Amino acid sequence: MAKKNGAQSVETIPGRKIVLSAGVGKTNIDELKWLTDTVLASASAWKSTGWAYIADCSQMSPVTPAEGSELVTMTKKFVNAGCKAFAFAEGKSIMLKVQAQKNTQRSETGVLEGHFVTVDEALAWLKNEVNI
């Protein structure tokens, strides 16, 4: 069952070490902090074995620079907590893809990332290419 706060929701993928978040519309820094804490709590048991994160951004509005900075902080926290790969489902939005790539780059974590149109494509990539 998904946990929800404002524009954000978080759930785990049954049988896999994957946390999926989805957003709709405009988010804010408080929701992003909640998102970070909720994802970390959901993945806490997998720190030693590794896990993956999927962000379904396909229905999100672009973020502000301040929100982008919060996403950079989130990325660092996820990697420090054992996240091995980030997968982004961005629909057909070039803007969301560019923002996600820049935020990951700014995190300076070197985490593996993939960009996809759908969550199903992201799940397949994590299974076939990342083995999660």
Please annotate each region the language model reported.
Residues 1-132:
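Amphipathic, Lys/Arg-enriched alpha-helical "gate/interface" segment within cytosolic domains
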